């Protein structure tokens, strides 16, 4: 891993103002090293997704600062955020959001056509663990786990520096979920991609470099694993 943090998060707050004021983040301080595999744990509403959305440029902080390498992205405008997302960040969510009328290969090609130095779509699908004979299948012809692997391939095809994953195994059974985690681990290992995974499954923390525990909008504690478990050894 690089010595320099890829993210530096300083006293970040997030307040949603409506009929009820919600303090989603209450002064988060955190440094994330390039090439780390992080798992974020905590109950619903503890701030995990809010922080990841801010890191990914999908939301903005109410206060504090977020640095990506040496750039303060805290108050980027929409055009700057769009460029930042396009050039540096890949996203994997619980729901796959594939285009139903396109094959697996074509879904990935949608990204590679606008990226600067993309992977070949077939290579991205192979790395994500989708069998070659399934590349020309449509989403409706694929299992949930296969669709998630297409979504992962789509996210990594542009070679992002950061891969942000919000409950990527949340809708999957244990066997399929482990295969998805193996794909994320391979991307982290082979490309040095910084990977953040939000999950409610405490056991997944064993495969991380560090586990960040959230509670009430704050980082409650941080665990460091001296050795990382293989996804296949995780008790679901």
Residue ranges and their predicted role:
Residues 5-208, 213-214:
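ABC family nucleotide-binding domain
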Residues 218-236:
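Conserved beta-strand-loop-alpha-helix hinge in the C-terminal portion
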């Amino acid at each position: 891993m690089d010595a320099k943090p890829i993210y530096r998060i300083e006293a970040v707050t997030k307040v949603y103002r409506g009929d009820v004021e919600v303090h989603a983040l209450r002064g988060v301080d955190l440094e994330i090293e390039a090439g780390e595999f992080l798992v974020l744990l905590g109950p619903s509403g503890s701030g995990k997704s809010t922080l990841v959305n801010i890191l990914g440029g999908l939301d903005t902080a109410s206060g504090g600062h977020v640095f990506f390498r040496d750039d303060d992205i805290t108050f980027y405008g929409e055009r700057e955020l769009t460029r930042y997302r396009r050039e540096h960040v890949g996203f994997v969510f619980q729901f796959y959001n594939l285009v139903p009328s396109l094959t697996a290969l074509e879904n990935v090609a949608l990204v590679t056509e606008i990226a600067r130095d993309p992977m070949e779509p077939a290579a991205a699908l192979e790395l994500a663990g989708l069998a070659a004979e399934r590349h020309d299948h449509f989403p409706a012809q694929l299992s949930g786990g296969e669709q998630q692997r297409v979504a992962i391939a789509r996210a990594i095809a542009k070679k992002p520096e950061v891969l942000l994953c919000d409950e990527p195994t949340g809708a999957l059974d244990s066997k399929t979920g482990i295969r998805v985690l193996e794909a994320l681990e391979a991307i982290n290992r082979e490309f040095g991609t910084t990977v953040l995974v939000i999950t409610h499954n405490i056991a997944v923390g064993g495969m991380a470099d560090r586990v960040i525990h959230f509670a009430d909008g704050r980082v409650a504690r941080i665990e460091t694993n001296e050795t990382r478990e293989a996804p296949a050894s995780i008790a679901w």
